[in-house]
Amino acid sequence: FLYLRDGRIAAEYAPRDLLLLPETDVLGMGLRSPHEGKCLPAPSVLDESPAVLKTAGLSKRIRKEVVFDDVSLSFPEGKVTAITGQNGAGKTTLAQILCGLAKQTRGHILIDGKKARAAVRRREIYYCGNDTSTQFFTASVAEELLLNAKLTEESKGRARHLLKEFGLYEYRDAHPSALSGGQKQRLAIACAVFSGRRILILDEPTSGLDGQNMRLIAERLKSEARSGRTILVITHDRELIESCCDTVVEVGTKPGEVQ
């Protein structure tokens, strides 16, 4: 393994040596942990946090294929929920239905206990997809963050703070397409945070990010949850789940099943 820093090879490790690195060294180098951990249990029905977002008997079929069937879930306020499962299990389909970008076959989605039509969900929920190349519409990073904001000194100050936190301030005048893959991911998440919407759905937000930036995102998601936001994260990222998620929903353990 080669460890690169500032465009140079800073170290070289045999697999065994990498596994033996102290955890403090791994963190200091901004790397992912090479060790397996334990994922969280499924959500507890005893969680007393108020459910902002719910599904009731939600089903989705594509032609004759059952994507999921009769799914009833609760996503509590102030919590980060991981949605996991194999590729093709229906995680992104579920997320797009929740935020009003796709239509369910049967069932209802409720916000604050009331049935919410797709148009309402599109206003209430911010969806950050897994293809960042299709999500940016302006000529600069700063403009992207402020796209739907009322331009005030307060909003511009918040934008500056967020860009600095996400390591993007020096690129504020750059076109989003000029960013690296990881920088685009951070910008997309920054836009979600800046949106002010109280329900965020993030699809693979840390895929391909190094340990340092994964932990940055995890800490920010925990902070947003503490402020009262309801956050859903579609992810295969074990470390992200362990770092910030309160509960786990697993899609596709059996055909059409969500746990």
Language-model segment annotations:
Residues 84-86:
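The feature captures the beta-strand-to-loop junction immediately N-terminal to the Walker
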